Amino acid sequence: MREWAVAVGGAAAVLAIGAITPTAALASLVREWDVFAFLLGLFVIVAIAEQSGIVDRLTVFAWCHAGGRRDRLLVLVSAVAALVTVTLSNDATVLILTPLVIALCRALAVPVLPYAFACVLMANAASLVLPVANPANVIVLHDAPVRLGSYLAIAALPSAAAIVATVAALLFVFRADLRGGLADPPAAPGDPDTTIVAVGIGAIMLAYLAALAVGWPVGAVAVSGAVLLVAARTARGHLDAGRFARGIEWAVLPFLAGLFVLVSAAERAGLGPVVAGALAEAEGAGALGTAGLALAAAAGSNAMNNLPFALVAGEGLRAAPGAGAPTVVALLVGIDLGPSFTTVGSLATLIWILILRKRGIPLTALTYLRIAFLPALAALAAAVLALATVSALAAH
């Protein structure tokens, strides 16, 4: 991942020209400690989950229950992708599930792209379900704390609409590839710690929900859970240290640090009040403004990638502390679902493209757009309409 060098280089440049002082840059990083802790803990949890074979079992489960039908298999792979996204994050879905799906498709001589696209598009669509399902959500909510109950009340319908619309659109787009049957699935690889790790991840999810409900930092939960999983795996003598270290996306941390410094410099130049003004206008326009804000966030996420856009949105929310939960969720609808339109819209999509290329599946940006456009549009439109409906009902 070379993007980290661009972000760090940009941060060095704004420091060199005096757009931000070293003290202010360091303060911006310390202020976001919860985001860094969450990501580090998440990457460790994902690496442990990959070693333990949990997702392998889920993938083979989908194959076993597809009834020999490719379309049913697509629905089940989408369901597995949604489950992995909600429990581990959208980045985990593309990192762990995509390689397994590609390998299984090749073993069974079925087209790869329908199921590979189910991984990446569902990773984005399902990441709206919970605040911890997407690192971008954590970034935004760090600057605009929304209680879990309020978040779920507003995001539940848009999330469900996006997931259903994505699956329906995938079935339509790949209808020609989904004709035909399936061979017998391969056996899932065995691992003595699968159950232990699965229970551990379930406990971490409950701890996430508890932390969100009372306003505690989720980064502390992620790091604590990661330490316990590593300790359990090590104590049983089943930790492959080399594979574990390689499975962590270390480059994301300097990438994010560089972005924090860049956005902090932009804030000092007056970005925060500008974004805050736009948020206030959207809130004043009711349900229509909420829908427009989601679409604007989707456009911004594709223009600059959703992580830096999440940082920009966070700066705006910090400058507008009175922003309500509907406004915050509207931003996240665009930030989570909008990136599905392009190959550069989200970190998950960038990782997914690299995984395909490493496995001999070159995919141009134009080909991606041609395939993903309808599912992405369906998901975003369904979520925006659902959000507008929820906002209108709440206003009355």
Language-model features: where?
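Juxtamembrane and boundary regions of transmembrane helices in multi-pass small-molecule transporters
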Residues: V110, G149-P192, V214, L337-H396
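Long, contiguous bundles of hydrophobic transmembrane helices that form the permeation core
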Residues: I163-D240
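Membrane-interface alpha-helices at helix entry/exit sites of multi-pass transporters
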Residues: G68-L76, R106-C119, V146-L157, P321-V333, ...
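Alpha-helical transmembrane segments and, especially, the helix-loop junctions at the ends
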Residues: T85-L95, V112-V146, T166-L171, A298-L311, ...
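Hydrophobic alpha-helical transmembrane segments in multi-pass integral membrane proteins
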Residues: P135, M205-L212, G258-G277, A382-A388
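Interfacial loop-to-helix junctions that mark the boundaries of transmembrane helices
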Residues: M1, A24-V35, L148-P158, G190-D193, ...
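Hydrophobic mid-bilayer segments of alpha-helices in multi-pass membrane transport proteins
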Residues: M1-I20, E32-V44, V197-M205, G215-T234, ...
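Membrane-embedded alpha-helical segments and adjacent helix-loop junctions characteristic
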Residues: L26-L113, V252, L256-G322
